[in-house]
Regions:
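Conserved acetyl-CoA-binding loop-helix of GNAT-fold acetyltransferases
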Residues: 105-119
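A short, well-structured alpha-helix characteristic of acyl/acetyltransferase catalytic modules
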Residues: 1-51
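Short, charged helix-to-loop "capping" segments that act as catalytic/coupling loops
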Residues: 15-26, 30, 70-73, 96-109
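Acetyl-CoA-dependent GNAT
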Residues: 45-102
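Long, contiguous binding/interaction regions
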Residues: 123
Length: 123
């Protein structure tokens, strides 16, 4: 899915693209604070592997993979992904990663899940 921007009070949700993937993002997956609940981060990943993973999802209409960006600063703090999306039955599996530790516990998930799920419901 291309050219999607969903606005919330504090965040912009934009389609995740390979140009966003850098060392900071890689640290979220490989670092000591990684989530044990993110299947993709079970093993150490290289920047190339992560970019390939993101690229493989960029043009797939059954996947909505969004970066979470702070509106005021543009800082990328995490991701939310719906995969696969069943538009006919209005069903999707959702996963979220708040990679920036400073933003954990501050209601990010609530805000972005509400806005992105409403957007998806209306699509």
């Amino acid at each position: 899915m291309k050219n999607i921007t969903i606005e919330t009070n504090r965040f912009l949700l934009k389609v995740l693209t390979v140009d966003i993937i850098g060392e900071r993002y890689l640290d979220w997956l490989n670092g000591s604070n990684k989530s044990e609940y993110i299947n993709y981060s079970i093993q150490e990943r290289t920047i190339e592997e992560v970019r390939d993973y993101v690229a493989s999802r960029e043009n797939d209409n059954s996947i909505l993979f969004l970066g979470i960006f702070v509106r005021k600063s543009g800082e990328h703090i995490g991701n939310i992904k719906y995969e696969p999306i069943d538009f006919l039955n209005k069903y999707a599996i959702m996963g979220i990663l708040i990679g920036d530790m400073e933003w954990r516990g501050k209601g990010v998930a609530t805000e972005v899940i509400q806005s992105s799920s409403m957007w998806l419901h209306n699509e």
